Amino acid sequence: MALALFAEIHVRDFQAAKPWYVQFLGESAFAAHDTEEVWELAENRSIAVEEQPENAGHSAVTVFVDDLDTWVDGIVARGIEPTKRETYDNGVRKVTFHDPDGNEIGFGGPPL
C-alpha cells in the first residue's frame, strides 16, 4: 500500500507568513492558490501552509527524519532558532520550532 502525507498549517495572513516558511523550508514546490502554498519534504510527503485566520496558531506537525542534525543545522543556518530541544527516555530526539502565528513544527530523529 502506497502512503502519501499532506499536512496543513493554518496562518492568519499567508503573505505575511510566507517569508518565514521560505526561510524555514526553502522555496515551495507549488502555489495551490493566492493564499496557499505547498512544500514537498520528500516524495508524497508535503506540508501546505494556508491562510485560515480562524484556525491560525493551532497546528502541530512533527516530521521524523533520519538526519535530524542536518535538518536542524540547515534551518538554524537560515536564521531560525528552535524553541525547544528534547531527548526522550528511549533516546529519540525532537527539535521544535514555532512560526510567528504560534504553530508548532517539530523534527524528530532516532537516538544517536
Where do the language-model regions lie?
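N-terminal beta-strand motif that seeds the catalytic metal site of vicinal oxygen chelate
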Residues: 1-18, 59-61, 111
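Short glycine-enriched loop/turn motifs at secondary-structure junctions
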Residues: 1-3, 53-58, 88-89
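Conserved active-site tyrosine of GNAT-family acetyltransferases
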Residues: 17-22, 75, 102
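Short secondary-structure junctions
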Residues: 25-32, 82-86
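Conserved short beta-strand elements that form part of the metal-binding/catalytic scaffold
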Residues: 27-59, 104-110
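Short hydrophobic/aromatic beta-strand element in the GNAT-like acyltransferase core
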Residues: 38, 46, 62, 82, ...
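Mid-chain, well-packed structural core segment of small domains
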Residues: 61-86
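Vicinal oxygen chelate
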Residues: 78-112
